[in-house]
C-alpha cells in the first residue's frame, strides 16, 4: 500500500501543478474536464522535469523529491479548486449510478465493468511480468538509474524514441520500485475511463457514459496492458483529451481550446511515436472544419499557428533529442529516409519488415474488410479489438441524423485508421481511436431506442458478451499474479512459479518456467565485480535481461549493431570489439555444444547471411572462456579472462556453489 499511496500523492501534486499551469495560461476547460486536463498536464510536465534531471546527471531520490516539493508549493494555491472538482466528479458518478441501475441490461453491463476493473486493479499490485514491459518500459529506465543519467543506449532500439511514460516510470523506480511505476500507469487507465465516462455523460447522459466505457473494455488488448507498466494508457489519455479539446473548439471557436488540443497532441507524440498519427489526424480534421466554416485564409493560418505552436512546445524536444543522438528524428523508424547511427538495413529488415510479413497485406479490399478481420481474426493484427468497430456500422443508416460531434469523432478515427492500416497494422496501436469509436457506439445504441429496439438490444447483448469474454481473459491474466500481490511467497518464488506466459516446452507444449532468468541473474550478480560489464548474447529466443543489476549491453545479432556481427570474422575481431566496449562477462542462452540451431533466422533467412561468420566467431570465442555458471535452465555466464575452460557440473542457478563468489 505504500506504493499505491505514493502514486496517489504524486497524482495529487501533478493535478495541482496542472491546475496552476492552466490558470497561468488563462485556459479554463469546460466542466468536469478541468480535473482530467490538469491531472494529465501535470504528469506530462513531470515527464519533462525527469528528462531534464536525467540529461544533467541528476537522477537521485533527493532530486526527485525536491522537484515534487517545489511543484506542490507552486500548486498549493489550487487546493480548493482541486477539492471542488473532486467533489463535483464524485457527485456526478453517484448520480450516474442511480440513473443506470433501474435498466436490467445496463445493470449487468455495470457489474461486468466493475468486475473487470476490480480484477485488473488487484493484478496491478503484482511484480511486473509482461516481457515488453520488463525488457523495454522498465529496462531502459533501470539502466538510466544505474548511472543517474539519461544517455543514448544504442543496443536498446527504442531508447531514443519519445519516452514521457518511461520518464514517469523512472521517477517511481527511483523512489520506490517498479510496482509503484506499474500502479502509476494503471491509474492512467482509470483516469482514461473516468474521462471517457464524464465526456460522454456530459453529452449523452449516464447511460451513454457507461456504454462508452463498456465499449472500451470490450477491447481484448486493453485488459492485457491495463495492469502493466506500459505507455498505452497514458498515450490514449492524452489523445482523448486532445480530441475533447477539438470538439470543444468546434462549439466555441475559442483559441484556448486549440491550445489545449496542441498541448495534448504534443504530449501524445512525446509518449509514443504513433502519437504523431494522432496529431496529424487532429490537425487534418481541424483544417476540414475551418474550411466548412468558411474561415478566411488569415484566420485559418492564425488558428493553425496556435495549435501547432503548443504542439511543437510539447513534442519537439523528444524528436530533437532523437535527432541529436542518432541522426534520425524518428529513430529507428524510416531508416531508408533518415538513416540512423548504430542501425543498418539488416536490422531494419528484422525489426520492421520481417515481422510485418505475417500481417494483412496492404490492398483496397483488405482495407475495406479489415474492421471485420480485426474482430474475428485478430491474430493477423496480434490482438482483437472487440465489438466496437462492428457496433458502429448501423450508424451508416443514421448518417443524416448524426450530430456534428459524432461526425468529427468519425473523421478523426477514419484518418487515423487509414494511417494505421498503411504503416502499423498492429491492433494495440489502435488504442487512441478506441475511445472515440466507443462514444460513437454508445451514441448509436441510444439513438436506436426509437428506431429499432431489436437492433439496440442485439448490440447491447453483443457488448455484454464481449465484456464477459474479457472478464474471463482478465481472470486468466491476473489470477496467476495474485500470489505476488498477497505475499504468499517471496519474489524469487513468484518469478520461479509463474506460468502464465507463452514460453512452452517444444515437446509437450506445456507452459514452462516463465522467468528462469530471475534466479540466473541473481546468481550472476553474486559473482560479478562492482566494475563488471555484461553483454547479453541471444539469437531468436526471448531473453528477460531486465533482472540484471549490473550495466549491460545487448549483443543481439539481429537487434543492434554496436557489436557489428557483419564485420567480425574471427575470435580476434570479437575479443577486440568486446575489449573496446569494456565487456568483462557474457550472459547467454545459446548452447555452445549445439552451435547455431538450424531453425535460427540467421541460418534460414538469406537476409542475415552477412551475420553468420560473426555469430560463429562469437561462439568460437566463448568456447575458450571460463564458465562461471552453467544452469540447468540453459543459461550460461562466461568470464572474458584467461583461456582455460572451467567445467562445472550441470546445476540449477539456485544451487550454484557459493565457493564461486569473488
Predicted segments, located by residue:
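Transmembrane-helix motifs of polytopic, lipid-linked glycan transferases
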Residues: 18-19, 44, 72-78, 183-203, ...
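Transmembrane-helix signature of polytopic, membrane-embedded enzymes
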Residues: 28-38, 179-180, 196-219, 237, ...
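Short periplasmic/luminal acceptor-recognition loop of GT-C membrane glycosyltransferases, typified by
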Residues: 508-555, 585-593, 638
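Hydrophobic, aromatic-rich transmembrane alpha-helices
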Residues: 114, 191-193, 197, 287, ...
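Signature aromatic-anchored transmembrane alpha helix within multi-pass, membrane-resident enzymes
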Residues: 106-113, 207, 259-265, 279-286, ...
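Membrane-proximal, lumen/periplasm-facing interface regions of secretory-pathway glyco-
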Residues: 131-137, 466-523, 541-542
